[in-house]
Amino acid sequence: TTALSKRKTAFCLGVIIFLASYPLFLEYMAIGHDLPFHLLRIDGIKAGLSQGVFPVKIQPVWAYDYGYATGVFYGDILLYFPALLRLMGFSVQSAYMTFVAVINLATTLISYFSFKKLFNSSRIGLIGSMLFTLSYYRMLNVYTRAAVGEYCAMMFLPLIFVGLYQILTMTEKKGWWKKAILPAIGL
Protein backbone atom coordinates (compact mmCIF):
# COMPACT_ATOMS: atom_id res chain seq x y z
CA THR A 1 0.00 0.00 0.00
CA THR A 2 1.17 3.46 -0.81
CA ALA A 3 1.51 6.36 1.57
CA LEU A 4 -1.48 8.05 -0.12
CA SER A 5 -3.76 5.05 0.43
CA LYS A 6 -2.61 4.85 4.06
CA ARG A 7 -3.54 8.51 4.50
CA LYS A 8 -6.92 7.93 2.88
CA THR A 9 -7.53 4.96 5.17
CA ALA A 10 -6.52 7.00 8.24
CA PHE A 11 -8.82 9.82 7.12
CA CYS A 12 -11.76 7.44 6.61
CA LEU A 13 -11.16 5.86 10.03
CA GLY A 14 -11.06 9.35 11.54
CA VAL A 15 -14.41 10.16 9.91
CA ILE A 16 -15.93 6.97 11.33
CA ILE A 17 -14.61 7.82 14.81
CA PHE A 18 -15.92 11.39 14.49
CA LEU A 19 -19.38 10.23 13.39
CA ALA A 20 -19.57 7.65 16.18
CA SER A 21 -18.52 10.29 18.71
CA TYR A 22 -20.54 13.21 17.34
CA PRO A 23 -23.17 13.14 20.14
CA LEU A 24 -20.33 13.78 22.59
CA PHE A 25 -19.78 17.23 21.05
CA LEU A 26 -23.27 18.49 21.88
CA GLU A 27 -23.71 21.19 24.52
CA TYR A 28 -25.35 18.69 26.84
CA MET A 29 -24.87 15.07 27.78
CA ALA A 30 -27.77 12.81 26.85
CA ILE A 31 -28.88 10.79 29.86
CA GLY A 32 -29.06 7.17 28.78
CA HIS A 33 -31.20 4.60 30.57
CA ASP A 34 -28.37 3.15 32.68
CA LEU A 35 -26.14 6.23 32.77
CA PRO A 36 -26.67 7.31 36.41
CA PHE A 37 -25.78 3.79 37.57
CA HIS A 38 -22.56 3.71 35.53
CA LEU A 39 -21.54 7.23 36.56
CA LEU A 40 -21.90 6.12 40.16
CA ARG A 41 -19.77 3.06 39.36
CA ILE A 42 -17.04 5.36 38.02
CA ASP A 43 -17.23 7.51 41.15
CA GLY A 44 -17.24 4.38 43.31
CA ILE A 45 -14.03 3.13 41.72
CA LYS A 46 -12.50 6.60 42.09
CA ALA A 47 -13.44 6.67 45.78
CA GLY A 48 -11.99 3.22 46.36
CA LEU A 49 -8.75 4.10 44.56
CA SER A 50 -8.43 7.34 46.52
CA GLN A 51 -8.69 5.26 49.72
CA GLY A 52 -5.84 3.05 48.50
CA VAL A 53 -7.98 0.03 47.58
CA PHE A 54 -7.13 -1.98 44.47
CA PRO A 55 -8.97 -3.74 42.98
CA VAL A 56 -12.09 -1.95 44.15
CA LYS A 57 -14.68 -4.65 44.80
CA ILE A 58 -16.82 -2.79 47.33
CA GLN A 59 -17.39 0.76 46.16
CA PRO A 60 -17.70 3.01 49.21
CA VAL A 61 -20.04 5.68 47.77
CA TRP A 62 -23.08 3.39 47.55
CA ALA A 63 -25.81 2.81 50.15
CA TYR A 64 -25.23 5.94 52.22
CA ASP A 65 -21.47 5.33 52.30
CA TYR A 66 -21.79 1.77 53.59
CA GLY A 67 -20.62 0.56 50.19
CA TYR A 68 -21.92 -1.93 47.68
CA ALA A 69 -20.15 -4.77 45.91
CA THR A 70 -20.85 -3.77 42.30
CA GLY A 71 -17.34 -4.90 41.38
CA VAL A 72 -18.35 -8.47 42.21
CA PHE A 73 -21.23 -8.47 39.70
CA TYR A 74 -19.88 -6.20 36.97
CA GLY A 75 -16.55 -6.26 35.20
CA ASP A 76 -14.99 -2.95 36.18
CA ILE A 77 -11.61 -3.17 34.45
CA LEU A 78 -12.44 -0.77 31.62
CA LEU A 79 -14.01 1.72 34.04
CA TYR A 80 -10.68 2.22 35.79
CA PHE A 81 -9.74 4.57 32.92
CA PRO A 82 -12.53 7.11 33.60
CA ALA A 83 -11.99 6.63 37.35
CA LEU A 84 -8.34 7.64 36.87
CA LEU A 85 -9.52 10.66 34.87
CA ARG A 86 -11.74 11.52 37.86
CA LEU A 87 -8.70 11.32 40.15
CA MET A 88 -6.92 13.73 37.79
CA GLY A 89 -9.71 16.28 38.25
CA PHE A 90 -12.11 15.56 35.38
CA SER A 91 -15.82 15.87 36.10
CA VAL A 92 -17.68 12.56 36.03
CA GLN A 93 -19.43 13.66 32.81
CA SER A 94 -16.15 14.58 31.09
CA ALA A 95 -14.52 11.35 32.24
CA TYR A 96 -17.44 9.29 30.90
CA MET A 97 -17.53 11.17 27.59
CA THR A 98 -13.78 10.67 27.16
CA PHE A 99 -14.26 6.98 27.94
CA VAL A 100 -16.98 6.70 25.27
CA ALA A 101 -14.72 8.44 22.72
CA VAL A 102 -11.88 6.00 23.50
CA ILE A 103 -14.28 3.04 23.19
CA ASN A 104 -15.46 4.41 19.82
CA LEU A 105 -11.83 4.72 18.71
CA ALA A 106 -11.01 1.19 19.84
CA THR A 107 -14.17 -0.26 18.26
CA THR A 108 -13.36 1.42 14.95
CA LEU A 109 -9.75 0.20 14.90
CA ILE A 110 -10.46 -3.34 16.13
CA SER A 111 -13.26 -3.80 13.62
CA TYR A 112 -11.18 -2.32 10.78
CA PHE A 113 -8.20 -4.59 11.38
CA SER A 114 -10.45 -7.61 11.94
CA PHE A 115 -12.42 -7.14 8.71
CA LYS A 116 -9.22 -6.28 6.82
CA LYS A 117 -7.60 -9.50 8.07
CA LEU A 118 -10.70 -11.58 7.36
CA PHE A 119 -11.21 -10.36 3.78
CA ASN A 120 -7.62 -9.34 2.97
CA SER A 121 -8.86 -5.95 1.77
CA SER A 122 -8.41 -2.51 3.27
CA ARG A 123 -11.55 -1.28 1.50
CA ILE A 124 -13.71 -4.04 2.97
CA GLY A 125 -12.05 -3.37 6.32
CA LEU A 126 -13.22 0.25 6.13
CA ILE A 127 -16.74 -0.68 5.04
CA GLY A 128 -17.01 -3.35 7.73
CA SER A 129 -15.67 -0.97 10.36
CA MET A 130 -18.13 1.71 9.33
CA LEU A 131 -21.10 -0.68 9.31
CA PHE A 132 -20.15 -2.21 12.65
CA THR A 133 -19.13 0.95 14.53
CA LEU A 134 -22.05 3.03 13.28
CA SER A 135 -24.63 0.24 13.43
CA TYR A 136 -27.95 1.32 14.86
CA TYR A 137 -27.88 -1.26 17.64
CA ARG A 138 -24.40 -0.27 18.81
CA MET A 139 -25.18 3.44 18.73
CA LEU A 140 -28.42 2.75 20.62
CA ASN A 141 -26.39 0.88 23.26
CA VAL A 142 -23.93 3.75 23.60
CA TYR A 143 -26.18 6.81 23.57
CA THR A 144 -29.74 5.72 24.41
CA ARG A 145 -29.33 2.75 26.69
CA ALA A 146 -25.87 3.67 28.07
CA ALA A 147 -25.29 -0.09 28.31
CA VAL A 148 -21.59 0.20 29.15
CA GLY A 149 -20.96 -3.51 29.52
CA GLU A 150 -22.69 -4.32 26.26
CA TYR A 151 -21.03 -1.74 24.04
CA CYS A 152 -17.64 -2.52 25.58
CA ALA A 153 -18.18 -6.22 24.86
CA MET A 154 -19.28 -5.41 21.31
CA MET A 155 -15.90 -3.79 20.76
CA PHE A 156 -14.33 -7.27 20.80
CA LEU A 157 -16.88 -9.14 18.64
CA PRO A 158 -15.01 -8.71 15.32
CA LEU A 159 -11.80 -9.89 17.01
CA ILE A 160 -13.53 -13.01 18.31
CA PHE A 161 -15.09 -13.69 14.91
CA VAL A 162 -11.83 -13.40 12.95
CA GLY A 163 -10.00 -15.57 15.49
CA LEU A 164 -12.63 -18.30 15.35
CA TYR A 165 -12.65 -18.13 11.55
CA GLN A 166 -8.88 -18.60 11.50
CA ILE A 167 -9.10 -21.60 13.82
CA LEU A 168 -11.88 -23.25 11.83
CA THR A 169 -10.21 -22.73 8.44
CA MET A 170 -6.68 -23.84 9.37
CA THR A 171 -5.32 -26.57 7.15
CA GLU A 172 -2.77 -27.95 9.58
CA LYS A 173 -3.69 -28.68 13.16
CA LYS A 174 -0.24 -27.92 14.56
CA GLY A 175 0.00 -24.55 16.31
CA TRP A 176 -3.79 -24.08 16.62
CA TRP A 177 -3.29 -22.47 20.02
CA LYS A 178 -1.55 -19.49 18.38
CA LYS A 179 -4.73 -18.78 16.42
CA ALA A 180 -6.81 -19.16 19.60
CA ILE A 181 -5.13 -16.09 21.10
CA LEU A 182 -7.34 -13.61 19.16
CA PRO A 183 -10.71 -14.96 20.32
CA ALA A 184 -9.34 -15.45 23.84
CA ILE A 185 -8.36 -11.77 24.00
CA GLY A 186 -11.84 -10.87 22.80
CA LEU A 187 -13.49 -12.94 25.50
Where are these regions (language model features)?
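Start-transfer (signal-anchor) and selected internal transmembrane alpha helices
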Residues: 1-24
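Hydrophobic alpha-helical transmembrane segments
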Residues: 10-14, 98, 126-130, 180-184
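Membrane-interface transmembrane helices that cradle and orient dolichyl/undecaprenyl
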Residues: 160-179
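Membrane-interface helix-boundary signature
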Residues: 5-9, 93-99, 160, 179
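Active-site lumenal/periplasmic loops and adjacent helix-entry segments of GT-C-fold
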Residues: 20-118, 123-156, 163
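Membrane-interface helix-boundary motifs at transmembrane edges
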Residues: 2-4, 116-120, 169-175
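Short, intrinsically disordered, charge-balanced linker/junction segments flanking boundaries
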Residues: 2, 176-187
